[in-house]
From Swiss-Prot:
The gene is Gja5. The chain crosses the membrane at residues 20-40, 77-97, 164-184, 205-225. A connexon is composed of a hexamer of connexins. This is Gap junction alpha-5 protein. It comes from Rattus norvegicus (Rat). One gap junction consists of a cluster of closely packed pairs of transmembrane channels, the connexons, through which materials of low MW diffuse from one cell to a neighboring cell. It is found in: Cell membrane; Cell junction, Gap junction. Keywords: Cell junction, Cell membrane, Gap junction, Membrane, Phosphoprotein, Transmembrane, Transmembrane helix. Its main location: membrane.
């Protein structure tokens, strides 16, 4: 087996900028696949061709039978599976780093323009803001957003398809378990030849283990798709429903809010001597009508009218109530509450006065 350090360093960077389920998936990939494959599984398949025996001395027959039994070695097949499954994550990491660098350059250009205009800024602050625009961490959880979220979802879809393809391919090539006896009927073997696999039980244990880990990785990928995709769809549907409710309630609310009284309407009612007829405009807006809108403005102005030598017609004079009028129909208290004496007529004789 080769050195896994190069691939491990890249996957560590992916681990830093993944969701919680993505971190679990990477942990499974590191421990249960790469570590087990590099230590235990490789030693079990190290002698498979040397210990593969057939009941024949025909030259080339044993090699042909081994090629028929193992089109590709299990260990090499799993290495290819790990590489193909990990490649989308590496592409995502490359796109994330490229996005961060581009945003850092953009922020730096904006800072230089602001500095020329009289502002200040630092590169470290801009780099931090650029990173937060791609992803943000809330309570220890990574929340992806923007184009980086779309790339991450595509990465999960590709690796899910790879997992399914390799699991189906392994089942079609080998099945689930290895047989101890393999019967070979290929040329140049003169007749059916019995061949024997080395340590089949130990190899079957690793085959089942690797299949189970692949199934676990597939389940985690589907769970992460649900976490990122389905919840986002539900949130958008909820927002659209709330927007429809606001649109339905919006016109009626604005109509009610648009019907407002004059600024001094309630104050005029409160300043009246008798507050029997006072009520807030907002409570019963259309219950009563003001018979004369100018009356509330003219009564306070009577204090400013100077007493001159002619008779004034005042709104505060109590009118005569007809005998047929009902007691329930009363004028507002402010209408005849002014008890000041009427302005007296001049003592000088006028031509139109009646002689007694």
């Amino acid at each position: 087996m080769g050195d896994w350090s190069f691939l491990g360093e890249f996957l560590e960077e992916v681990h830093k900028h993944s969701t919680v389920i993505g971190k679990v998936w990477l942990t499974v990939l590191f421990i249960f696949r790469m570590l087990v494959l590099g230590t235990a599984a490789e030693s079990s398949w190290g002698d498979e061709q040397a210990d593969f025996r057939c009941d024949t001395i025909q030259p080339g027959c044993q090699n042909v039978c081994y090629d028929q039994a193992f089109p590709i070695s299990h260990i090499r097949y799993w290495v290819l599976q790990i590489i193909f499954v990990s490649t989308p994550s590496l592409v995502y990491m490359g796109h994330a780093m490229h996005t961060v660098r581009m945003q850092e350059k953009q922020k730096l250009r904006e800072a230089e323009k602001a500095k020329e205009a009289g502002g200040t800024g630092t590169y470290e602050y801009l780099a931090e803001k650029a990173e937060l625009s791609c992803w943000k961490e809330v309570n220890g959880k990574i929340v992806l957003q923007g184009t980086l979220l779309n790339t991450y979802v595509c990465t999960i879809l590709i690796r899910t398809a790879m997992e399914v393809a390799f699991m189906v391919g392994q089942y079609l090539l080998y099945g689930i378990f290895l047989d101890t006896l393999h019967v070979c009927r290929r040329s140049p073997c003169p007749h059916p030849v019995n061949c024997y696999v080395s340590r089949p039980t130990e190899k079957n244990v690793f085959i089942v283990f690797m299949m189970a880990v692949a199934g676990l990785s597939l389940f985690l990928s589907l769970a992460e798709l649900y976490h990122l995709g389905w919840k986002k769809i539900r949130q958008r549907l909820a927002k659209s429903r709330q927007g429809d409710k606001h649109q339905l309630l919006g016109p009626s609310t604005s109509l009610v809010q648009g019907l407002t009284p004059p600024p001094d309407f309630n104050q005029c009612l409160k300043n009246s001597p008798d507050e029997k007829f006072f009520s807030d405009f907002s409570n019963n807006m259309g219950s009563r009508k003001n018979p004369d809108p100018l009356a509330t403005e003219e009564v306070p102005n009577q204090e400013q009218i100077p007493e001159e030598g002619f008779i004034h017609t005042q709104y505060g004079q109590k009118p005569e109530q007809p005998s047929g009028a009902s007691a329930g129909h009363r004028f507002p208290q402010g209408y005849h509450s002014d008890k000041r004496r009427l302005s007296k007529a001049s003592s000088k004789a006028r031509s139109d006065d009646l002689s007694v």
